Amino acid sequence: MHPAHLLVLLAVCVSLLGASDIPPLPLNLVQFGKMIECAIRNRRPALDFMNYGCYCGKGGSGTPVDDLDRCCQVHDECYAEAEKHGCYPSLTTYTWECRQVGPYCNSKTQCEVFVCACDFAAAKCFAQEDYNPAHSNINTGERCK
């Protein structure tokens, strides 16, 4: 093999090793995103909800900016309740399917059922509320006290 080819191969291997340090999203969050898209019938990507209002996304505080943000607050509270029962919501995967009428949970274990129910309720709530682009990526430090 030509030395230049070896250098290119080495560079690719090193960059792949570096990329392996990037943590993936917990599988449950991927499932939750798919469940949201099922419930809202793909009207918008689930990622649009990641930084919405005071509660949609990581953490949450203050008063929800609207009813959609309130869906996220209730979801956070549901996850907190699951943790009190010994579950790890962000790591718990569950079995569900997207049916004609929307998401349907068919998990078996207590934690899977609990977490799926939290995600199901939030996804259905998202489907019933309006998305206001003005509430996306707000300054939570100022707005969510």
Curated annotation (Swiss-Prot):
The organism of origin for this protein: Oxyuranus scutellatus scutellatus
Record InterPro entries: PLipase_A2, PLipase_A2_Asp_AS, PLipase_A2_dom, PLipase_A2_dom_sf, PLipase_A2_His_AS
Keywords on record: Disulfide bond, Secreted, Signal
An example Gene Ontology molecular-function term: calcium ion binding
Similarity remark: Belongs to the phospholipase A2 family. Group I subfamily. D49 sub-subfamily.
Tissue: Expressed by the venom gland.
UniProt subunit comment: Heterotrimer of alpha, beta, and gamma chains; non-covalently linked.
Record's keyword annotation contains Disulfide bond: yes
Top-rank taxon, per record: Eukaryota
Signal sequence extent: 1-27
Biological process terms in GO annotation: arachidonate secretion; lipid catabolic process; phospholipid metabolic process
GO cellular component term, pick one: extracellular region
Location relative to the cell: Secreted
Protein name stated in the entry: Neutral phospholipase A2 homolog taipoxin beta chain 1
Disulfide bonds, paired cysteine numbers: 38-98, 54-144, 56-72, 71-125, 78-118, 87-111, 105-116
Gene3D superfamilies, A to Z: Phospholipase A2 domain
Known role: Heterotrimer: Snake venom phospholipase A2 (PLA2) heterotrimer that acts as a potent presynaptic neurotoxin by blocking synaptic transmission and synaptic vesicle recycling. May act by binding in a calcium-dependent fashion to neurotonal pentraxin-1 (NPTX1) and neurotonal pentraxin-2 (NPTX2), but not to neuronal pentraxin receptor (NPTXR). Also binds to taipoxin-associated calcium binding protein 49 (RCN2), a protein localized in the lumen of endoplasmic reticulum. Monomer (beta chain): Snake venom phospholipase A2 homolog that is neither toxic nor enzymatically active. Does not bind calcium.
